[in-house]
Amino acid sequence: MFWQPGCTSCLRTKEFLTRHGVDYESINVHGNDAGMQALRELGARSVPVVARGKAFVFAQSLADVVRFLKLDIKPHDKLSPQQLIDKLDLVLAAATRYVRQIPAGKLEQPFRNRNRPIRLLAHHVFRIPEAFVEAMQERRELTYELIMQPPGEGLRTQEDLARYGEGVRAAVKRWWKTYPDSSCGQMMDTYFGRHRVHEVLERSAWHPAQHARQLMLLLDELGIEPDGRLTAEDLAGLPLPEKAWDD
């Protein structure tokens, strides 16, 4: 399995494989030229990836991993689309509060063993659902490049990022209010395959939720009490990893 630290789906997949007794070789591609080369030789450009020989599957969807490995495992029960929207709203509101608490001098520093500025992590929390909404509104594929689009020059400070987050939160609400298929049963193209909108919405909710947990962890390590912690009840029903960070 190919992964890197701080990657939400990587941690979730590793925990999933371990929990179900699947032995695997762990290849951390972060700062590992040989590991990254092996990943590219498969034909993949992003992680997590589960591979057998030259065959591989992107592991953003555990259902895809189950099919690829031919595991006899029942998929988890998803929250309804409305419940996912409500959870996402809680997460975005919380992340906006946390971003405002990050000391200015820390924004360009990395967190733990991931060589990525904290400012980019904070931006990524909001970019995930923003990219989903853009893909839905423009009827285009949800690409890796769309999700990983970097922040513009105007997003430098805590307040810049927080206001950006507030804008994304409002955009999600506007999209959902006018989206005609409340069951989210239609199919959409993504960089990890073709899936129902319901499944991609679920990922667009739990993925930023996991990063919001990482922002709480960051504040804890700085000795700052997060402003209104996300609780287990707040996150109940989202298919999150057990841990907030994978070392």
Language-model-detected regions and their locations in the chain:
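Local sequence-structure signature of Cys/Sec-based thiol-disulfide redox active-site neighborhoods
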Residues: 1-26
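Thioredoxin-like thiol-disulfide oxidoreductase module
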Residues: 27-45, 69
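Structural micro-motif
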Residues: 40-51, 60
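Non-catalytic, surface beta->alpha helical segment in thiol-disulfide oxidoreductase systems
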Residues: 51-77
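Short, charged, low-complexity loops and linkers
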Residues: 71-84, 153, 160
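Alpha-helical bundle segments that constitute or directly flank the non-heme di-iron/ferroxidase center
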Residues: 78-102, 123-134
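Acidic/histidine-rich alpha-helical segments that form the ligand environment
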Residues: 88-98, 153-191, 195-214
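Short, contiguous alpha-helical
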Residues: 106-151, 189-247
